[in-house]
Amino acid sequence: MLPDGLSAEDEQRCRQLLARTTARLRSRPAAAAVLVPLCLVRGVPALLYTLRSSRLVGRHKGEVSFPGGKCDPDDQDVIHTALRETQEELGLEVPKEHVWGVLQPVYDREKATIVPVLANVGPLDLQSLRPNLEEVDEVFEMSLAHLLQTQNQGYTHFCQGGHFSYTLPVFLHGPHRVWGLTAVITELTLKLLAPGFYQPSLAVPELPRG
């Protein structure tokens, strides 16, 4: 039987596992932070995603992402950044006590640090959200059960200069394909929530050394 990922036991276990990373990273400088929203949609445990507006400037427009953005000098820490950006993008207020902790950071092509913040936002009616249409085209969920099914998992191989460079996870057969760093963060989350059920064959890439 698949775990629901949102039980009191799951929360306690995840908070304990994330405590050290949270203490180490929450106040460390970072380029950006994103919220990884655990939620219940029609009673089903899920992760909440956004489709970035096609009107945005830059290479990430129209991509699937978690709510989040650049750290502001006035932000107290990366948790504050993630919660502020979620409110600005979705009109969703997430109390700080609903945050379970900080996940392992990921890095973009420019080696900028992006810190994922895991929180349980509870039961959610997507129709009640007020997305900022300048930043978000769509809000959708993918259930944990869907994400944990092997037929919905894959990998994308990237090449640079005609040579194999790196491989990242991809999650398929939902409203939109989840790939790139959003898929990496999804993989980190599934490894934490369901270690006995999600066992990827690919290690999450780390910041290149040197």
UniProtKB/Swiss-Prot annotation:
Sample GO molecular function, one term: magnesium ion binding
Record field: catalytic activity: an acyl-CoA + H2O = an acyl-4'-phosphopantetheine + adenosine 3',5'-bisphosphate + 2 H(+); CoA + H2O = (R)-4'-phosphopantetheine + adenosine 3',5'-bisphosphate + 2 H(+); acetyl-CoA + H2O = S-acetyl-4'-phosphopantetheine + adenosine 3',5'-bisphosphate + 2 H(+); butanoyl-CoA + H2O = S-butanoyl-4'-phosphopantetheine + adenosine 3',5'-bisphosphate + 2 H(+)
Entry GO CC: mitochondrial matrix; mitochondrion
General function of this protein: Acyl-CoA diphosphatase that mediates the hydrolysis of a wide range of CoA and CoA esters yielding 3',5'-ADP and the corresponding 4'-phosphopantetheine derivative as products. Hydrolyzes short- and medium-chain acyl-CoAs, exhibiting the highest activity toward free CoA, hexanoyl-CoA, and octanoyl-CoA and the lowest activity against acetyl-CoA. Exhibits decapping activity towards dpCoA-capped RNAs in vitro.
Cofactor: Mg(2+); Mn(2+)
This enzyme's EC code(s): 3.6.1.-, 3.6.1.77
Manganese among keywords: yes
UniProt entry keywords in alphabetical sequence: Hydrolase, Magnesium, Manganese, Metal-binding, Mitochondrion
Pfam family, one: NUDIX
Identification of the protein by name: Mitochondrial coenzyme A diphosphatase NUDT8
Binding site for Mg(2+): 85, 89
